[in-house]
Amino acid sequence: MIFLIAIIPALCWGINPLLVGKINGHSENEMFGMGIGDGLIALIFWLFSQPTVTISGVTFGLAMISGAAWAIGQLGQYISYRLLGVSKTMPISTALQLVGTSLIGVLMFGEWGSSNQKILGLLAIMLIVAGSALSAGTSDGRKKGFSCYLPLLMTTIGYWIYSCIPKLVKVDALQLFLPQMLGILIVAVGWAIYHQPTVYRDKQSWQNTLPGILYGIAAFMYILSARSIGVTNAYIIGQLSVVISTLSGLFFLHERTGQQSIVSVATGLLFIFMGCVTTALI
């Protein structure tokens, strides 16, 4: 059952680039819709569960920082979809996130404690990084300058922060969920309105609430799985989203493979899947 919970974020995160690409708005529209959608999901879960608030102000603030950091990471992905394409952004983003979250989980939280677990974990990381490298470069065959990669490189730290904070605070996952979503709502909507004051008038802004709702569901399920199987395992399983998003970029958003053969892409995705399965079995 916990594996099913852990795989839901991968499905939601994988589908979202396709939805965002089909809506075809701007980064401001996407951030606005994401913030509203996440806030709506948080409110629904909160009303239905009616949890008693027992967390301290410090814990509440840390959870908000976690959500705000995630919004920064997602902004980098939205920008990179246009600069690099979905099918190139997602494999690179996966590898970047993996390195950071793995180091955090192992060094800060003592995960993969035994020698065998460390060997299997290292093997899983190698498979996923190799798979991401093989799968990348599938956008249109044109070379990209380093500046096109900067938004993704600079904002990935947001995902690292988001993934580790739930492990720092020993409270019920539902207690963290609302403040996390509030952090996303404030940063995402605030950034969108700051850069485009009339963003709320755009049709694409409200269409992007659907991806935002799916992100909210994924975030809730991620918190549950991270507390059960570890932040590293939960996050790596979530990176199966790269399989869904890369294929959707190629076949539904019509991004081209350029000189890289489809065999290389398929092999890379297989490596990623094998790495995620290996991690789940540690």
Curated annotation (Swiss-Prot):
Membrane topology qualifier: Multi-pass membrane protein
Keyword hit for Mitochondrion: no
Keyword field contains Magnesium: no
Transmembrane portions of the chain: 2-21, 31-48, 53-75, 90-112, 119-136, 146-163, 176-194, 209-226, 233-252, 262-281
InterPro entries from the UniProt entry: Sugar_transport
Compartmental location: Cell membrane
One GO molecular-function entry: carbohydrate transmembrane transporter activity
Classification via CDD domains: GRP
Homology family: Belongs to the GRP transporter (TC 2.A.7.5) family.
Descriptive protein name: Putative sugar uptake protein lp_2594
Organism: Lactiplantibacillus plantarum (strain ATCC BAA-793 / NCIMB 8826 / WCFS1)
Biological classification of the source: Bacteria, Bacillati, Bacillota, Bacilli, Lactobacillales
